[in-house]
């Protein structure tokens, strides 16, 4: 198997893209630490991996909390003995509202989960990757903030996704000498549960009409992508087949962002 003997940390690992990535990495032989804040969902995902013959453990932590993240990351390494792969998938859409409507607390929450959470994950995981002599990091960004800016009111979300890509490209240079690769996947419209935590308010005030060619997603005629399709790319970036790729965003959107 492609990742036999490797250990992976996946934040947001119990749902959506994170869960799909956890299942995919485990199926290829990786031992996976699934990190999230809902223990019951984590336990269910771990059982699913184990039922398929894989190895996994649940790590309950808030990605914005340094103490919880430090404990969780250390527990993973203590349990499996090493760390080779990090998938920073935890994130929220947050509140989408005009800039003069979204409150400071709403803004701060999106920034905290998506940007501070990414920072905290990498801040605490990179020392273990350095100790291991290398590794691969995959950050889950978005077409929003990197190619697409026409989702009205998504300013906080887009800022975090642009920020994640900046982190990836900055760290590609910083971490290269340690044989640590870092890349980003930028999904478009994907069938996940993330829309359940999107709170849209007065979006019409922040929206600009967009002229669409026929078919919202050219490759599929409008059909959304799947978390498993994103996970396939995460698997590629996690393994040795992408050994000369770093600092690179990959848009997984069926050409959707090229229309906007």
Give the location of each predicted region.
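Short C-terminal tail/terminal secondary-structure segment
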Residues: 4, 93-96, 234-235, 246-260
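Conserved glycine-rich cofactor-binding loop
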Residues: 14-15
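Alpha-helical segment proximal to the catalytic Tyr-Lys
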Residues: 127, 173-177, 243
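Active-site helix of classical SDR
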Residues: 122, 160, 168
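Short, small/polar-rich loop/turn modules that mediate ligand/substrate recognition or access, typified
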Residues: 87, 134, 176, 181, ...
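Residue(s) in the substrate-gating loop at a strand-loop-helix junction
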Residues: 142
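Substrate-binding pocket helix/loop in short-chain dehydrogenase/reductase
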Residues: 97-99, 103-111, 137, 215
């Amino acid at each position: 198997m492609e990742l036999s003997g490797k250990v992976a940390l996946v934040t947001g690992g119990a749902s959506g893209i994170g869960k799909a990535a956890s299942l995919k990495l485990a199926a290829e032989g990786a031992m996976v630490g699934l990190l999230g804040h809902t223990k019951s969902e984590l336990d269910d995902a771990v059982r699913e991996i184990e039922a398929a013959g894989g190895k996994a453990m649940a790590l309950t932590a808030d990605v914005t909390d340094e103490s919880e993240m430090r404990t969780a990351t250390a527990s993973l390494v203590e349990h499996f003995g090493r760390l080779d792969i990090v998938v920073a998938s935890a994130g929220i859409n947050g509140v989408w509202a005009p800039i003069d409507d979204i409150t400071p607390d709403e803004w701060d929450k999106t920034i905290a989960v998506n940007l501070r959470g990414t920072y905290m994950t990498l801040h605490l995981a990179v020392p273990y990757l350095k100790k291991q002599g290398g590794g691969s990091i995959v950050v889950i960004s978005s077409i929003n903030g990197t190619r697409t800016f026409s989702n009205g009111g998504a300013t906080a979300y887009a800022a975090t996704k642009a920020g994640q890509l900046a982190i990836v490209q900055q760290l590609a240079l910083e971490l290269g000498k340690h044989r640590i690769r870092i890349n980003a996947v930028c999904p478009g419209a994907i069938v996940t549960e993330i829309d359940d935590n999107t709170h849209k308010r007065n979006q019409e005030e922040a929206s600009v009409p967009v002229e669409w060619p026929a078919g919202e997603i050219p490759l599929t005629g409008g059909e959304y992508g799947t978390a498993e399709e994103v996970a396939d790319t995460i698997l590629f970036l996690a393994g040795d087949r992408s050994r000369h790729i770093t600092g690179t965003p990959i848009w997984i959107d069926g050409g959707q962002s090229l229309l906007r």
